[in-house]
Amino acid sequence: MTIYNQAIESYNEKMAKDVIMLAGRILLESGAEGSRVEDTMTRIAITLGHKESNSFVTNTVINFMLHDESYPRMYRIRTRDTNLHRISRTNGISRRLALGDISLEDAFQELQKIYQEQSIK
């Protein structure tokens, strides 16, 4: 019989992953390079008290794990564009989180707005 370690996600962990993954997705789909996306995701995690997070980003996939006892998240990137405005706004939200100027929930709402906006062609 195999016994699996079943991690239970708290609301804060789920919200942290939601914010981190959405920020990563916006950045990568907007043309940011993978190492910059990983750096931003890691910085947000550290800001939220998760110093042992792991992220791995390629041109088509984002993988993220908050800590060893949490479920990993993976997202496949299907579209890419160049949108420096979206990158700048997403980085601004990351900075505001680091400074404590915005709550996790507000950051998620602002990131959702950025994500839902159409790219300017």
Features from the language model and the residues they span:
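Core alpha-helical transmembrane segments of integral membrane proteins
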Residues: 119-121
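A short structural micro-motif
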Residues: 44-47, 113-117
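N-terminal loops that bind phosphate or other acidic moieties
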Residues: 100-109, 113
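Soluble N-terminal domains of membrane-associated systems
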Residues: 1-102
